């Protein structure tokens, strides 16, 4: 059987080649050493590749003391050349937790722990309130919680939200007749309508003393006494004192025309 040759070790970061050694030295501030003095060059490059890879991923700058190199697993510590002092850098930043902030009194604040959901007692766990919220007074029975819920409801109501760039639309006033309950949008129309119930005629003719409910009706009536008929029919030339009388007269002409056309067809 022939001798089996072991393959060369593969770097942890494949994109870093041996030519990047000078770049790694510039980044980490290492002294320039010829490559022939580094027998374990692959391990040296792989070690710095981990540091560079962590730097490119955007991990926070958390440093470990130099004594932490002794706690590194053997597979990784064997890659480090003991002749060079490497700067301290985080080996596994996703495992290391950030230091808790110390308050002014010198005490470390307790971590906020949320109780686990009890799947064995689903009904009880779903209905009970969060103890952290109850301690802060955010329960439904507390005054602060009820006021906040009330404010949220008023924010969502469309009546409280004015439209941007537009004035709120005014509601139309309604005038209701006290006799029959009929609705009107103008007070004048309601006044004239109520006179039909009360038979009130405040406008009286000075000549014949005839009374009218509306002022325009009295104006049309005065044309009779003046012999002036401003509304004239264009077909027969007959004059009328009121426009509504002329409109009724025109319907008679249209009916006569319809009768003539029907006789011709027969």
Swiss-Prot record:
SMART domains under this entry? ZnF_C2H2 (SM00355)
Q: SUPFAM superfamilies in the record, alphabetically?
A: beta-beta-alpha zinc fingers
Looking up InterPro entries in the UniProt record yields:
C2H2-ZF_Transcription_Reg, Znf_C2H2_sf, Znf_C2H2_type
Lineage top rank: taxon: Eukaryota
Q: Which residues form a coiled coil?
A: none
**Biological processes, Gene Ontology terms:** cell differentiation; cell proliferation involved in kidney development; cellular response to retinoic acid; chondrocyte differentiation; embryonic digit morphogenesis; embryonic forelimb morphogenesis; embryonic hindlimb morphogenesis; embryonic skeletal joint development
Classify the main location. nucleus
Q: Which GO terms describe its molecular function?
A: DNA-binding transcription factor activity, RNA polymerase II-specific; RNA polymerase II transcription regulatory region sequence-specific DNA binding; sequence-specific double-stranded DNA binding; zinc ion binding
Q: Does the keyword Chloroplast apply?
A: no
Expression sites (tissue/organ): Expressed in adult colon, small intestine, prostate, testis, and fetal lung.
**Which Pfam families does the annotation name?**
zf-C2H2
**Listed PANTHER family:** ODD-SKIPPED - RELATED, PROTEIN ODD-SKIPPED-RELATED 1
| Name of this protein | Protein odd-skipped-related 1
- Organismal lineage: Eukaryota, Metazoa, Chordata, Craniata, Vertebrata
């Amino acid at each position: 059987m022939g001798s089996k040759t072991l393959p060369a070790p593969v770097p942890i970061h494949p994109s870093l080649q041996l030519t990047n050694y000078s770049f790694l030295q510039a980044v980490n501030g290492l002294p320039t050493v010829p490559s022939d003095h580094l027998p374990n060059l692959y391990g040296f490059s792989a070690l710095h590749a981990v540091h560079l890879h962590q730097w490119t991923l955007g991990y926070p700058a958390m440093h470990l003391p130099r004594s932490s190199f002794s706690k590194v697993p053997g597979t990784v510590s064997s890659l480090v050349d003991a002749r060079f002092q490497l700067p301290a850098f985080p080996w596994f930043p996703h495992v290391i937790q950030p230091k808790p902030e110390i308050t002014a009194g010198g005490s470390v604040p307790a971590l906020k722990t949320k109780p686990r959901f009890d799947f064995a007692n689903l009904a009880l766990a779903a209905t009970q309130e969060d103890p952290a919220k109850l301690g802060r007074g955010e329960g439904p029975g507390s005054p602060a919680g009820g006021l906040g819920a009330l404010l949220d409801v008023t924010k969502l109501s469309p009546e409280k939200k004015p439209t941007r760039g537009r004035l709120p639309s005014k509601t139309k006033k309604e005038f209701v007749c006290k006799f029959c309950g009929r609705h009107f949008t103008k007070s004048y129309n309601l006044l004239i309508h109520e006179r039909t119930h009360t038979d009130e005629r405040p406008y009286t003719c000075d000549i014949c003393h005839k009374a009218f409910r509306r002022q325009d009706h009295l104006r049309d009536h005065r044309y009779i006494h003046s012999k002036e008929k401003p509304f004239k029919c264009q077909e027969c030339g007959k004059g009328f004192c009121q426009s509504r009388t002329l409109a009724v007269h025109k319907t008679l002409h249209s009916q006569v025309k319809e009768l003539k056309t029907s006789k011709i067809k027969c």
